């Protein structure tokens, strides 16, 4: 382009179009900026023309009325002026500096003349720009008046622009005259360029409206309705442009048929009086399409006809629905009066209106631009390898890599003509368009574009192809051009052609994406060097042209010679990039990224096999491969994808999974997804450190972004930690948190996901290491060298092992810790291979075994004690930042107030924790490091079993975390360590004590006291507390929270924290549910241990004991595998729901977190779970042990799974619990998740889990239906909460992962109830058996268990504690549901939890209609929606108004967040139904 421009601009500025456009565009902009340019031009003009200042001035004055454009166009130099003043010096109108520079650098030099500037200076910026332009362009260019619209002129003699504002004319060009200027110059548009030209060069031609009409009918609808908005019609130059014919037709149809047309138009309940019919848009309703041969068609109706009357009633201004109803009322007889508007489109007009489209010309182009920006951002971000490669390929490579293709293009362009060249050039510069165009064209033509690219001579074939492609395109354009249409028309056609080509290719790719991949995939592999491109190439096909375009472009860009090196590099860069994308699709994504071509070849073959859930990959890929996902990603979740695109690619990459996840979760758990969005937004702002740091965080989906951001942030921290000796082991763990799930998804898909979350970060840095292995290696780097190898190896079938290693990063710490604990050789349930002790599955299995043993052992008095000790959960709940009196609370505290910090810390802590976990992994492994893998927090799960956790949970946790002591010498463990892992706790650093406390609890099993050090407890704590309270009251809130009710955000950067926390929890805070456990323990110290145990069960693990019961109730069945998860009421749900939640909220990369979020019910871990959950968890604590073990593995898996949203290999693959949850989730959102889980879960287990999942779902429903059961429990509220929660959760989360989510929340509720109501003994008793039999217990069984538990709980010392706790929770359960408890509140009311608020506030004892305004305010506060109480009070909303509040009313009351509205509506419904 540059060369062409230079060539042309040296003498004339042939591309007047640019200036013309600029001028046109600048007209509005003609403000200071424009004037400045004008001034400069003016001075230039003056210099060149040497026009006297007076002349300039006069010109300026006279031109005041002229449009800046015209003024500009008016040459200010009289001397060589063709007419009037101006010599059209190429530079007089230097509107577009670039052109000016190109065109007349010399002139520019001469031009600048201060004097003239002075002349212009009188016209200050305020002065008319026109005036400026006038004196700038004195002379012929002065606009005297507007031309009569609609007249058509044809150029009779060619004209080359002499000045900037002029346009070139070629004989035969159709020229549309826009205005008449001085000096015999007219302003008009030709070939899409607008500018001045001598009037003598054109001759008027009589329009042949009919001619146009013929062309317009078909095009009319498109042109009119597709490309123009109503506004543009009005602004269309004039009615004269439109040929209007009206007709009245009578349509008579048969009963079984329609009229054969599709009506489209503005929606309005009442006629839109503001609508002013115009010739171009005479009515609001028009025929979008008419079925050929249909009744309407036969009557002469055509697409684009406007409905003026329906059955003799005027409908010009009537809204769509009303018109449709009027048509329906007529039955089979319809009288329509329609107006057919035929636009008299001259090529100029078309060009003018469509010129803009050229930029839009191809979605590809737009994408390209966007991609470019993304790439640029990525470059900035540091995806230097992947992003840079892609960027370079796209941006720079166009010249470097595309050189061959570019030359061909240039040649072709030149041959075709400057305009064609221009068009081509544009795509070329975009690179994307050309490539995509070519691809699309080739694809459509059945040409294997990729093959040349892929196969051996990337250069030749690729370039050749591109050339061919280009030629083809050109030829197409040429054909179009040569089809006998005038040059002008040709030009118009050309851009449209490109546009169509691109559009077609793009759309085709979208629709045909799946098929194309199969045919093309083989080709793309060859470009493996450009792994990004080639491998993607097929994928792109799959996804759409966008991808292919990218691939092609990159390929084209990549020079043949460079191909090997570049390919390798690109492959690395892009490979990394795409690897993530591809990983989504391909089990061998790793292979793809492998350095050796062989893997790529394998990948190709695999690539052919799309993941069962391409979209699960899409999210990842989309984020990762900024371009590829464009189509599928968009399809699945355009919002996310686009966000990613617009955001930096890195961001996208980083959140790829989350993105996808986000989408799904959004839909499924309306509340959560909403919140996720808000979270992402808030978090990003609030938690730049956590979320922001990872650019990927900005991923489209707030949730994904938040989670991804948190993960990325954490990964970055991990990276730093890794780099630092202190955190080496933890680092790995943390990294794995992000990557952990990928371990299971070690398969390319999974790992990519990892890459998306963790890897991406890594990718940024070590991304380049190798094309194929680099991404993994990066992960490995983060995980640890050994891990990398394992990952690579496991990339395929043994994803579990490899993944385990990978996940080790995140869960790795846990896993690693775990591995010593579970050195037993576990056999992969699915593959039958020996599992790596540190693999998530092995850890999960070992955790499960431990849990079983522990559950058999009984919970000891610990849990009960914890419960008794722990009113903490209340405190915690009440105030997230308050230490509720025990470490868990502290942790919550940390979370609440330090949410952001916590998030960051958590990540960091997670990292350190993970590292520590690595150090202690032997001890921790028992804890179900799997869960911890995902979330360091989970690590503590097994440890939880040990009642003798140690001193206070906090201490214990700290110690455990800090100290890698086995057992729970948590108190021994230095706080510093916990702090390090504190990140995990988020508040761990701030509140190491709390974390240790949790840890201790987590250390519930004596064996796993060491595990506690993982600091998993903190997350559980939050989770637990939340769960506990929310278990009873606000399981749903998590979704809502995600949905938008980020009450938790109040706690700390709630929105981000929520996500971050979620992520953290998932990763390191998975233990949040354990938080619940923590709070469960009545006594701080004793309780702590149980609590710790609960906590220890990271969100999922902790749950096993407690969750188990709860799960039984709410879906513990699921928890069977994830019984450990069940242990935490939330945790259990977490496990079940962890997948769901994870999917919903934290799908991105932190199962645990997600789990926690859901488990917490309301405020997921993310929001305030940490603080509030603890109190709630208290009761749960005692259960922690029994369920703990099972859950632990479960959660771990879940956590792992969640992080690897990539296509999960087999839904059942993951741990039972995880698999269960993940299955739904996997199918829905992440293939990886399942994969991740699968390593953890055995085949049978997976199946069982699936079964349990469904059962749990049903149970949840049943449970929610049986609040009575819950009520029967000593903690009736809990039970009730559980029940309501369960169903709500189901409903809320059901979208996301119906069962998982539902149960996720519900289990929390159930669990909390169970935990709180059941004595630890009971729990262990029940838990063990239940777990053993199947997490799924009949709802009756669950209720039985729960019911008995309450009595047991009451009887057992824990029970009193539970009762106490319950009393808090219980009030909290109802109130909590509404967010009365801080914990509850902090999680924005979980929709499902929104039961009656369990609160001591008066409103809880009164019927809704008797509530006073303060009661309503208290109720809102209980829903964690205290931010709205003022408006409710101001508007005097009392209980009698609540049932009648509609969405609009709520919006008027300031409840603009969907999640908040949902929470309110759900809570209201529960209140009214209670």
UniProtKB/Swiss-Prot annotation:
Residues 66-76, 1075-1085, 1307-1317 have a biased composition (Polar residues). It comes from Rattus norvegicus. Residues 66-125, 392-413, 504-534, 659-920, 947-995, 1057-1153, 1195-1216, 1260-1401 are annotated as: Disordered. GO terms for biological process: adult behavior; adult locomotory behavior; associative learning; exploration behavior; learning; long-term synaptic depression; long-term synaptic potentiation; memory. Belongs to the SHANK family. Residues 513-529, 1202-1212 have a biased composition (Pro residues). GO terms for cellular component: apical plasma membrane; asymmetric synapse; brush border membrane; ciliary membrane; dendritic spine; glutamatergic synapse; growth cone; hippocampal mossy fiber to CA3 synapse. The lineage of its organism: Eukaryota, Metazoa, Chordata, Craniata, Vertebrata. This is SH3 and multiple ankyrin repeat domains protein 2. It is found in: Apical cell membrane; Cytoplasm; Synapse; Postsynaptic density.
């Amino acid at each position: 382009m540059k060369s062409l421009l230079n060539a042309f601009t040296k003498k004339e500025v042939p591309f007047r179009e640019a200036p013309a456009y600029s001028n046109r565009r600048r007209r509005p902009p003609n403000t200071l900026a424009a004037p400045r340019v004008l001034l400069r031009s003016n001075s230039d003009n003056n210099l060149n023309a040497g026009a006297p200042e007076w002349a300039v001035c006069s010109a300026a004055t006279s031109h005041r009325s002229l449009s800046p454009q015209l003024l500009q166009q008016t040459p200010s130099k009289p001397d060589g002026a063709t007419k009037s003043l101006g010599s059209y010096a190429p530079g007089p109108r230097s509107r577009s500096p670039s052109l000016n520079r190109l065109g007349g650098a010399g002139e520019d030099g001469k031009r600048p003349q201060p004097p003239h500037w002075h002349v212009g200076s009188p016209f200050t910026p305020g002065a008319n720009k026109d005036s400026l332009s006038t004196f700038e362009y004195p002379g012929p260019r002065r606009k005297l008046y507007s031309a009569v619209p609609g007249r058509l002129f044809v150029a009779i003699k060619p004209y080359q622009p002499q000045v900037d504002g002029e346009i070139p004319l070629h004989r035969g060009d159709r020229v549309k005259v826009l205005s008449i200027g001085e000096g015999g110059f007219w302003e008009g548009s030709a070939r899409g360029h607008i500018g001045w030209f001598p009037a003598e060069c054109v001759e008027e031609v009589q329009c042949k409206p009919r001619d146009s009409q013929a062309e317009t009918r078909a095009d009319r609808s498109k042109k009119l309705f597709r490309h123009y908005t109503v506004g543009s019609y009005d602004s269309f130059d004039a009615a004269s442009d439109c040929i209007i014919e009206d007709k009245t037709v009578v349509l008579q149809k048969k009963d079984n048929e329609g009229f054969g047309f599709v009506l489209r138009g503005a929606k309005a309940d009442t006629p839109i009086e503001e609508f002013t019919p115009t010739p171009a848009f005479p009515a609001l309703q028009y025929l979008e399409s008419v079925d050929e041969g249909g009744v309407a068609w036969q009557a002469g109706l055509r697409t684009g006809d406007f409905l003026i009357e329906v059955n003799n009633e005027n409908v010009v201004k009537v809204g769509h629905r009303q018109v449709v109803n009027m048509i329906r009322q007529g039955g089979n007889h319809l009288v329509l009066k329609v107006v057919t508007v035929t636009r008299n489109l001259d090529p100029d007009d078309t060009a003018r209106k469509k010129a803009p489209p050229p930029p839009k010309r191809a979605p590809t182009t737009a994408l390209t631009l966007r991609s470019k920006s993304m790439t640029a951002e990525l470059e900035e971000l540091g995806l230097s390898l992947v992003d840079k490669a892609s960027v370079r390929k796209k941006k720079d490579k166009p010249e470097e890599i595309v050189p061959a293709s570019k030359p061909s293009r240039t040649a072709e362009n030149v041959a075709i003509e400057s305009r064609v060249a221009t068009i081509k050039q544009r795509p070329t510069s975009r690179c994307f368009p050309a490539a995509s165009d070519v691809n699309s064209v080739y694809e459509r033509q059945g040409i294997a574009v990729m093959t040349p690219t892929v196969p051996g001579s990337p250069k030749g074939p690729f370039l050749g192809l591109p050339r061919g492609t280009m030629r083809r395109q050109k030829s197409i354009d040429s054909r179009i051009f040569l089809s006998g249409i005038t040059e002008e028309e040709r030009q118009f056609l050309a851009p449209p052609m490109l546009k169509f080509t691109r559009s077609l290719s793009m759309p085709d790719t979208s629709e045909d994406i799946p098929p194309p991949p199969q045919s093309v995939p083989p080709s793309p592999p060859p470009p493996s060097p450009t792994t990004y491109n080639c491998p993607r190439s097929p994928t792109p096909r799959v996804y759409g042209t966008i991808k292919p375009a990218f691939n092609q472009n990159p390929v084209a860009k990549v020079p043949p010679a460079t191909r090997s090196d570049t390919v390798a590099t690109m492959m690395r860069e892009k490979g990394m990039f795409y690897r993530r994308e591809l990983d989504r699709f391909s089990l061998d994504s790793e292979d793809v990224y492998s350095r050796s071509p062989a893997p790529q070849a394998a990948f190709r073959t695999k690539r052919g096999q799309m993941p069962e859930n391409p979209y699960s990959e899409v999210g990842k890929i989309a984020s990762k491969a900024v371009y590829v996902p464009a189509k599928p990603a968009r399809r699945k979740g355009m919002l996310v994808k686009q966000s990613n695109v617009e955001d930096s690619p890195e961001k996208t990459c980083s959140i790829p999974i989350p993105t996808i996840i986000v989408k799904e979760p959004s839909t499924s758990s309306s509340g959560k997804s909403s919140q996720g969005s808000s979270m992402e937004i808030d978090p990003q702002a609030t938690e730049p450190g956590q979320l922001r740091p990872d650019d990927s965080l900005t991923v489209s989906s707030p949730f994904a972004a938040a989670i991804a951001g948190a993960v990325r942030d954490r990964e970055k921290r991990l990276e730093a930690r890794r780099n630092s000796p202190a955190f080496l082991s933890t680092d790995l763990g943390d990294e794995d948190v992000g990557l952990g799930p990928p371990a299971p998804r070690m398969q390319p898909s999974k790992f990519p996901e990892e890459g998306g979350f963790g890897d991406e970060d890594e990718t940024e840095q070590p991304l380049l290491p190798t094309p194929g292995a680099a991404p993994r290696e990066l992960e490995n780097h983060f995980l640890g060298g050994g891990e990398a190898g394992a990952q690579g190896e496991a990339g395929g079938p043994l994803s579990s092992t490899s993944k385990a290693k990978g996940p080790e990063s995140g869960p790795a710490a846990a896993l690693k810790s775990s591995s010593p604990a579970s050195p037993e050789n576990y056999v992969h349930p699915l593959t039958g291979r020996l599992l790596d002790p540190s693999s998530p599955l092995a850890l999960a299995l070992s955790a499960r075994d431990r849990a079983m043993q522990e559950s058999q052992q009984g919970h000891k008095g610990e849990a009960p004690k914890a419960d008794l000790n722990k009113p903490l959960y209340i405190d915690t709940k009440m105030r997230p930042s308050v230490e509720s009196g025990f470490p868990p609370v502290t942790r919550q505290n940390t979370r609440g107030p330090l949410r952001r910090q916590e998030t960051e810390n958590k990540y960091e802590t997670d990292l350190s924790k993970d590292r520590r976990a690595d150090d202690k992994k032997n001890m921790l492994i028992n804890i179900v490091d799997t869960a911890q893998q995902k979330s360091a927090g989970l690590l503590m799960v097994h440890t939880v079993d040990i009642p003798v956790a140690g001193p206070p949970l906090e201490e214990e946790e700290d110690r455990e975390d800090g100290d890698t002591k086995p057992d729970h010498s948590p108190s021994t463990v230095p706080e510093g360590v916990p702090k390090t892992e504190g990140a995990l706790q988020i508040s761990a650093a701030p509140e190491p004590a709390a974390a240790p406390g949790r840890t201790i609890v987590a250390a519930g099993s004596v064996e796993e006291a060491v595990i506690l050090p993982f600091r998993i407890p903190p997350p559980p704590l939050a989770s637990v507390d939340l769960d506990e309270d929310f278990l009873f009251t606000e399981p749903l809130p998590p979704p809502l929270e995600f949905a938008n009710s980020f009450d938790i955000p109040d706690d700390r950067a709630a929105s981000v924290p929520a996500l971050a926390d979620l992520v953290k929890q998932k990763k390191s805070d998975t233990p949040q549910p354990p938080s619940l456990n923590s709070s469960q323990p009545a006594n701080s110290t004793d309780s702590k241990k149980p609590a710790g145990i609960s906590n220890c069960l990271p969100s999922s693990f902790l749950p096993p004991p407690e969750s188990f019961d709860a799960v039984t109730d709410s879906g513990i069945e699921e928890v069977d595998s994830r019984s450990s998860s069940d242990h935490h009421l939330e945790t259990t749900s977490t496990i079940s729901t962890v997948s769901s939640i994870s999917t919903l909220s934290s799908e991105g990369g932190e199962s645990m977190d997600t789990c926690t979020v859901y488990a917490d019910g309301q405020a997921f871990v993310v929001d305030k779970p940490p603080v509030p959950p603890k109190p709630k968890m208290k009761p749960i604590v005692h259960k922690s042990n029994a369920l703990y073990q099972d859950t632990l593995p479960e959660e771990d898996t879940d956590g792992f799974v969640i992080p690897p949203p990539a296509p999960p290999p087999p839904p059942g693959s993951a741990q039972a619990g995880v698999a269960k949850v993940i299955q739904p989730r996997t199918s829905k959102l992440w293939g990886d998740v399942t994969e991740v889980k699968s390593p953890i879960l055995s085949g049978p287990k997976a199946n069982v889990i699936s079964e349990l999942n469904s059962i749990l779902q049903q149970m949840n429903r049943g449970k929610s239906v049986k609040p009575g059961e819950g009520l029967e429990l000593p903690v009736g509220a809990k039970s009730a909460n559980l029940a309501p929660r369960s169903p709500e959760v189901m409903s809320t989360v059901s979208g996301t992962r119906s069962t998982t989510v539902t149960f996720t929340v519900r289990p929390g509720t159930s669990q909390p109830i169970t935990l709180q109501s059941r004595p630890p003994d009971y729990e262990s008793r029940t838990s063990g058996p239940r777990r053993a039999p199947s997490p799924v217990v009949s709802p009756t069984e669950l209720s039985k268990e729960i019911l008995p538990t309450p009595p047991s709980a009451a009887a057992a010392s824990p029970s009193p504690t539970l009762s106490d706790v319950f009393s808090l929770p219980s009030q909290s359960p109802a109130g909590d549901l509404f967010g009365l408890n801080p914990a509850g509140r902090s999680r924005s009311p979980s929709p499902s939890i929104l039961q009656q608020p369990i609160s001591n506030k008066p409103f809880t004892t009164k019927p809704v209609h008797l509530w006073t305004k303060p009661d309503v305010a208290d109720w809102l506060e209980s829903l964690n929606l205290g931010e709205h109480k003022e408006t409710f009070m101001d508007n005097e909303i009392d209980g009698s108004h609540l049932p009648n509040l509609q969405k609009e009313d709520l919006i008027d009351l300031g409840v603009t967040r969907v999640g908040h509205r949902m929470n309110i509506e759900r809570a209201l419904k529960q209140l009214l139904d209670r």
